[in-house]
Amino acid sequence: MELVLKDAQSALEVSETTFGRDFNEALVHQVVVAYAANARQGTRAQKTRAEVTGSGKKPWRQKGTGRARAGSVKGPIWRGGGVTFAAKTQDHSQKVNKKMYRGALKSILSELVRQERLVVVESFGVEAPKTKELKAKLKAMNLEDVLIVTAEVDENLFLAARNLYKVDVRDVAGLDPVSLIAFNTVLVTADAVKQIEEMLA
C-alpha cells in the first residue's frame, strides 16, 4: 500500500501489515489500560490500629465510670487512632507482551490511516527553537491538535513545541499507544515511517 506525502507529489510504499490491518479494539484497550496502570505510583499508605504508635493499656476500667467502654486508644473511632480499612502500597503494573504491544501500535496506526488522521511529510522542522515559527508552519498546514513524530530527536522542534497547547513532539523510540490516540492528527516524517516499519516488523 502507499501513503501520499503531503509536501511532495509522490507516495511512500509501506507494509500493509503495519498500516493496513484491521482495528483490534479489545487489544488496543488492554494495552492502553496497562500503559496507564504502569504509570501509577501506588505509594499511598495509612496505618491500621495494629500499626499506630501508642499504649496497649485499657484507658479506663470496664464498669463504674459512666463512660463508654473502651479497650484501646488506638481504635479507629479515637483521634490519633488507626484507619479502619487502611490503604496500603500497591503494585498496579500489568505485563504486556511484545507481540501485544506491537499489535496495538499497528492497529492504531492503521486506524489513523483509515480515518485520514495520519499525515506523512518528506521532512519537518524549524530553523530555530521559536514557537512562533512552528505555530505559523502548523497553521499553514491547517493543523492544531497534533503529535509530530520524527526519526531522531530534533531539539529545535522539541523546544519550539514545548509551549504550544495540544502539540507534542516525539521521536520513533519515544512513541507509545497513549500518545498516538491522544491527538486529532499525527504528523510523521518519511524517515520516521521507515523506522516505525522496522521497529514493528
Swiss-Prot record:
GO terms for biological process: translation. GO terms for molecular function: rRNA binding; structural constituent of ribosome. Gene3D superfamilies: 3.40.1370.10. Residues 45-72 are annotated as: Disordered. The keyword RNA-binding applies. Keywords: Ribonucleoprotein, Ribosomal protein, RNA-binding, rRNA-binding. It comes from the Bacteria. SUPFAM superfamilies: Ribosomal protein L4. GO terms for cellular component: ribonucleoprotein complex; ribosome. Belongs to the universal ribosomal protein uL4 family. Part of the 50S ribosomal subunit. PANTHER family: 50S RIBOSOMAL PROTEIN L4, LARGE RIBOSOMAL SUBUNIT PROTEIN UL4M. One of the primary rRNA binding proteins, this protein initially binds near the 5'-end of the 23S rRNA. It is important during the early stages of 50S assembly. It makes multiple contacts with different domains of the 23S rRNA in the assembled 50S subunit and ribosome. Forms part of the polypeptide exit tunnel. This is Large ribosomal subunit protein uL4. It comes from Shewanella baltica (strain OS155 / ATCC BAA-1091).
